[in-house]
Amino acid sequence: MVEPLLSGIVLGLIPITLFGLLVAAYLQYQRGNQLGL
């Protein structure tokens, strides 16, 4: 009974985590450009 809920949570968290990492990398890249690296 718990497995479908758990898999749903995991499937929901994976895209959010990937999106968060993408945003963090993008912001770091932008900051690096501003510093002239």
Curated annotation (Swiss-Prot):
GO terms for molecular function: electron transporter, transferring electrons within cytochrome b6/f complex of photosystem II activity. Its main location: plastid. Keywords: Chloroplast, Electron transport, Membrane, Photosynthesis, Plastid, Thylakoid, Transmembrane, Transmembrane helix, Transport. InterPro entries: Cyt_6/f_cplx_su5 (IPR003683), Cyt_6/f_cplx_su5_sf (IPR036099). It is found in: Plastid, Chloroplast thylakoid membrane. GO terms for cellular component: chloroplast thylakoid membrane; cytochrome b6f complex. The chain crosses the membrane at residues 5-25. It is a single-pass membrane protein. One of its GO terms (biological process) is photosynthesis. Component of the cytochrome b6-f complex, which mediates electron transfer between photosystem II (PSII) and photosystem I (PSI), cyclic electron flow around PSI, and state transitions. PetG is required for either the stability or assembly of the cytochrome b6-f complex. The 4 large subunits of the cytochrome b6-f complex are cytochrome b6, subunit IV (17 kDa polypeptide, PetD), cytochrome f and the Rieske protein, while the 4 small subunits are PetG, PetL, PetM and PetN. The complex functions as a dimer. This is Cytochrome b6-f complex subunit 5. It comes from Pyropia yezoensis. The gene is petG.
